[in-house]
UniProtKB/Swiss-Prot annotation:
GO terms for molecular function: hydrolase activity. The lineage of its organism: Bacteria, Pseudomonadati, Pseudomonadota, Alphaproteobacteria, Rickettsiales. This is Uncharacterized protein RP471. Gene3D superfamilies: alpha/beta hydrolase. InterPro entries: AB_hydrolase_fold, Xaa-Pro-like_dom. It comes from Rickettsia prowazekii (strain Madrid E).
Amino acid sequence: MPQIYFNGPEGRIEGRYAKATSPNAPIALVLHPHPLYEGNMNNKVVYNAYKILVDNGYTVLRINFRGVGGSQGKFDNGVGEVVDAGAALDWLQQNNPNAQSNLILGFSFGAWIAMQLVMRRPEINHFLAISPPVNTIHKYDFSFLAPCPIPGFILQGDNDSIVSADDVKDLVNRLSNQQSHIKIDYKIINGADHFFRYKTEEFSKAINDYLITIQSNYHHHNNINEDKSKNQKKLFLY
């Protein structure tokens, strides 16, 4: 999992990158929590999510936002951080032109950034929002998801003292009711706090289960397309 640097809008951006063996492996970008509260790409939740994605065959990049670790610049209240995430996704795509799909995962503040990028980048196929900061003291607004264009997974602990589980549930309900064909999966881990302390096994299983689901759906969709293609060829031959 080598350390990398690439050019961002405010100078270099630092990241950790793990490339899958398959050239068409799906790619995933992982975003960390609030930089002013010691959030960085080595946060335990971020690292564990990164490792789970790697273990599931993804090519994965996690980054430090501007002003964090080896990334240049300074905190920009979420505005510049969205641009950083976009630059990171550009880098991932340029280095993996045959990737079969694009996924973005964010934890806490990183989830807010991730969801904004979802609205800007139509090539993103799935999102994972871990402990999204709905109605916190920072008043992060998720109303820009109108509607949410892609399916995703929201993971929350019921003992979260930073983000109310009820507020997250309200967000899930709102997103789920926007478009009937867009499925928003939601799971609460009992006893888990904002950082899923002492709940690593349950945390890992929840993400693993979701990744398995979307991969099986992807293969099912591909098989249907292959069958259609075969039928079209038969019709042409006859």
